């Protein structure tokens, strides 16, 4: 697909690096302006990293480090 809608990014997370729910600046790179978690095809993460990222974002939302939705977006 030469005219793909999704452009793959180079992941800022190296394989083996932990994804921490307290690292809000890193997590913000993987959510949209509306607060949705970006899919793996856009983030360029491995499947394990994507699962860890999803868990970290959900934990950060529970402890109010990230919003569940962003009404300004």
From Swiss-Prot:
It comes from Prochlorococcus marinus (strain MIT 9301). SUPFAM superfamilies: Ribosomal protein S18 (SSF46911). One of its GO terms (biological process) is translation. PANTHER family: 30S RIBOSOMAL PROTEIN S18 (PTHR13479), SMALL RIBOSOMAL SUBUNIT PROTEIN BS18M (PTHR13479:SF40). This is Small ribosomal subunit protein bS18. GO terms for molecular function: small ribosomal subunit rRNA binding; structural constituent of ribosome. It holds the Pfam family Ribosomal_S18. Part of the 30S ribosomal subunit. Forms a tight heterodimer with protein bS6. GO terms for cellular component: cytosolic small ribosomal subunit. Keywords: Ribonucleoprotein, Ribosomal protein, RNA-binding, rRNA-binding. It comes from the Bacteria. Belongs to the bacterial ribosomal protein bS18 family. Binds as a heterodimer with protein bS6 to the central domain of the 16S rRNA, where it helps stabilize the platform of the 30S subunit. HAMAP family: Ribosomal_bS18.
């Amino acid at each position: 697909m030469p005219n793909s809608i999704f452009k793959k990014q180079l992941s800022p997370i190296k394989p083996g690096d932990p994804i921490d729910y307290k690292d809000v600046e890193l997590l913000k790179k993987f959510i949209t302006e509306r607060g949705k978690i970006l899919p793996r095809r856009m983030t360029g993460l491995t499947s394990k990293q994507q699962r860890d990222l999803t868990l970290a974002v959900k934990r950060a939302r529970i402890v109010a480090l990230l919003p569940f939705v962003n009404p300004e977006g």
